[in-house]
């Protein structure tokens, strides 16, 4: 019988001695349409092997804990699966750098800092994410909007100070938003309004989890379960089981 995946475990977990720190601090390359990119190191928290062959690896990414549970693919042993899970965590850390608005060196931060009306070069990876974000905005008629950075900053400030923003402040923030006012094409992005700031937090973890799943499958690990604490994705079920068993507390 496959083990239960406990969805609330991340609230109580502690940092265990990492038996595979060197594996989680993996440096490799992401290969695909974007070309090659160095993978950043990942803060290791724990890795464990179960009697049924399952490998569980946890790492600190995107300000939270990502957990990858996986079974070795054909011709692999547990060590191979452990290494590949570490690569998947490093993949998430790589995309965090692509999508981060807090990292002053990121392409998104440079786009946020640029004046409106100016064409700003963006990397193929950032362009991919921005185009997907705009697709989501169109599909939801703006319910999802990657340009809401000014509103997010305003309400974070309001919460910190314990004072509601004034109507004028809200109107000012809203005028700087609007996904229709962002143009992305041919490696360039243009903001059509002053003060616009992009925030991809509404899709970042889910996007990273999708890329992790792609990497695991490419490396030959098809039976896996990824948990980013807010987004989960299951691959093929554990060997001999109809699916992954979840327990929600």
PLM feature spans:
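Mature catalytic core of soluble alpha/beta enzymes
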Residues: 2-249
């Amino acid at each position: 019988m496959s083990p239960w995946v406990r969805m609330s475990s991340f609230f109580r977990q502690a940092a265990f001695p990492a038996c595979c720190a060197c594996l989680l601090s993996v440096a490799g390359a992401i290969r695909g349409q974007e070309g090659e990119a160095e993978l950043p190191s990942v803060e290791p928290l724990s890795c464990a092997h179960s009697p049924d062959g399952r490998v569980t690896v946890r790492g600190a990414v995107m300000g939270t804990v990502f957990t990858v549970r996986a079974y070795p693919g054909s011709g692999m042993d547990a060590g191979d699966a452990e290494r590949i899970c570490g690569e998947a965590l490093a993949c998430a850390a790589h995309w965090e750098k692509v999508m981060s608005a807090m990292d002053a060196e990121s392409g998104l931060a440079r786009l946020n800092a640029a004046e409106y009306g100016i064409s700003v070069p963006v990397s193929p990876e950032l362009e991919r994410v921005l185009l997907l974000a705009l697709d989501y905005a169109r599909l939801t008629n703006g319910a999802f909007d990657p340009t809401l950075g000014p509103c997010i900053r305003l309400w974070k400030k309001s919460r910190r100070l314990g004072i509601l923003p004034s109507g004028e402040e809200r109107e000012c923030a809203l005028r700087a938003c609007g996904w229709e006012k962002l143009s992305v094409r041919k490696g360039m992005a243009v903001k059509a309004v002053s003060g616009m700031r992009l925030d991809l937090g509404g899709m970042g973890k889910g996007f990273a989890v999708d890329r992790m799943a792609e990497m695991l499958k490419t490396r030959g690990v098809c039976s896996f379960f990824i948990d980013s604490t807010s987004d989960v994705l299951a691959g093929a079920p554990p060997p001999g089981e109809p699916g992954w068993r979840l327990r929600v507390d």
